[in-house]
Curated annotation (Swiss-Prot):
It is a multi-pass membrane protein. GO terms for molecular function: steroid dehydrogenase activity. GO terms for biological process: steroid metabolic process. The keyword Transmembrane helix applies. The chain crosses the membrane at residues 53-73, 84-104, 153-173, 189-209, 275-295. The lineage of its organism: Eukaryota, Fungi, Dikarya, Ascomycota, Taphrinomycotina. GO terms for cellular component: endoplasmic reticulum; endoplasmic reticulum membrane; membrane. It is found in: Endoplasmic reticulum membrane. The keyword Transmembrane helix applies. This is Uncharacterized protein C594.04c. Belongs to the steroid 5-alpha reductase family. Keywords: Endoplasmic reticulum, Membrane, Transmembrane, Transmembrane helix.
Amino acid sequence: MTLASTMPIIYSASDAAKWKVAVSPYLYQLSNLKLLFTGKLNFADFYYNTNPFVVGLLLSFILGNVLWGVSVWTKNTSQVDRLWPILPTAFSLHFLFYGLGYNIASRRLMIMAFLQTLWSARLTYNYYRKGGYNRGAEDYRWVRVRQIMPKWIYPLFHYFYIHIFQVLHLYLLASPTYIAMLAGNERAFGAWDWIALELFMFMFVLEMLADQQQWDYYEARNHYNVDKTVPPRFKYDLLSLGRGFNATGLFRWSRHPNFLAEQLIWLSFYLFGAIASESLLNWTIFAWLGLVGVFQGSTRLTEKMSCEKYPLYRVYQDKVGRFFPRLDGSHWDIVDDDASLKED
């Protein structure tokens, strides 16, 4: 195959965002996987002679099945969780490498790949320090899901949602990079790109601060629970620690500022693709909307468990917005801890 048979012909920037131009004409190349497995194509030929979006689809499906097999073997559901900070960036780098190989990589494409690498490095480190990569570590929410879901449904949920859908979703989150690659330099990096870049950087710093505040609080709480002392580097009083959950710093105003930042980070990546293709709305927005849906569902489960564990959490829900701060300025204050002490 040639470049003409693996890449769409782009007559205008908007063509890069059209499903019927950029994706559907190449879905027949899914059959190239059979050629690879039968030895009729080596991997290099398969990689460079198959549409890059189709390559990503095939690799994500294969990886989802591999992770499902590992999960069944280890009886641990967090296999995808371990790769969550890595896969979107890996898929974006796939598009970057393809663009470099065919000399169509734009400044915008390189910036997107760099920003996603920053995102990946930070999230991987945060997941590592929380013990996510420890042998046998598993997200407590999956344990709860297994408990509440009918036994006959869970195997289907375990395969199709946790592994196939989630890996495919992580791939689709990187799809704006595909659009940016196709658009090339049809639209120069300009003011709107800078706005998307600034949105990313602001939310990146916000999420980093929120995660650090969360880490500091639970480190102090766990330390106090062990030996009834709080290291001097932590500035928490006993009322705050006795509450059991973090309601200080950014968490005074938002119950999940890190989740808010994460959703807006991926909105910024969507915007890069929309700007590159001059298409404010295109098919890649469904990946971002899917991420919003995932956060809605996982947050509901997390908060249900928090309400069962911490008596004050329902009060916290009433006073503080889930993601965005309340318009009326309502937030958590020290008097809320004092009031709870009196009630107890």
